[in-house]
Swiss-Prot record:
Gene3D superfamilies: 3.30.70.20
EC number annotated for this UniProt entry: 1.2.7.7
Reactions that this protein is recorded to catalyse: 3-methyl-2-oxobutanoate + 2 oxidized [2Fe-2S]-[ferredoxin] + CoA = 2-methylpropanoyl-CoA + 2 reduced [2Fe-2S]-[ferredoxin] + CO2 + H(+)
Entry-linked PROSITE patterns: 4FE4S_FER_1, 4FE4S_FER_2
Pfam families (alphabetical): Fer4_21
Entry-linked InterPro entries: 4Fe4S_Fe-S-bd (IPR017896), 4Fe4S_Fe_S_CS (IPR017900), PorD_KorD (IPR011898)
Enzyme class, spelled out: oxidoreductase
Highest taxon of the lineage: Archaea
Species, as recorded: Pyrococcus abyssi (strain GE5 / Orsay)
Descriptive protein name: Ketoisovalerate oxidoreductase subunit VorD
Keywords of the record: 4Fe-4S, Electron transport, Iron, Iron-sulfur, Metal-binding, Oxidoreductase, Repeat, Transport
Disulfide-bonded cysteines: none
Length: 105
């Protein structure tokens, strides 16, 4: 169990901000995928079966990178330059239209 006791608990209360305004200002940085490709270290890649896709866009909403985009026909596609192969899209897809396959390089 990860519980704070005694003095540590008191100190945690003292240094814990009560609101967002109490946090110190920090520089804003761009995420790595906005600047660099991240798909080259992927070991598994998602593959979309459009016959199973119902265009719910849950995969697009849950993708932590800008790797999934919506095509003109309404289906989703994957930009493998940015896909890290995390599998969140496949895990969240309600119709199992996305499967993860081993990357072949």
């Amino acid at each position: 169990m990860n519980t704070l006791f005694g003095k540590a608990k008191e100190e945690a209360r003292v240094i814990s901000p009560k609101s967002v305004d109490e946090y110190p200002e920090a520089p804003i940085t761009l995420g790595t995928t906005l600047v660099n490709f991240t798909g080259d270290w992927r070991t598994f890649m998602p593959v979309i079966d459009e016959s199973k896709c119902v265009k719910c866009y849950i995969c697009w909403k849950f993708c932590p990178e800008p790797a999934i985009y919506i095509k003109e026909d309404g289906f989703v596609a994957i930009d493998y330059d940015y896909c890290k192969g995390c599998g969140i899209c496949a895990n969240e897809c309600p119709t199992k239209a996305i499967t993860m396959v081993r990357e072949e390089k």
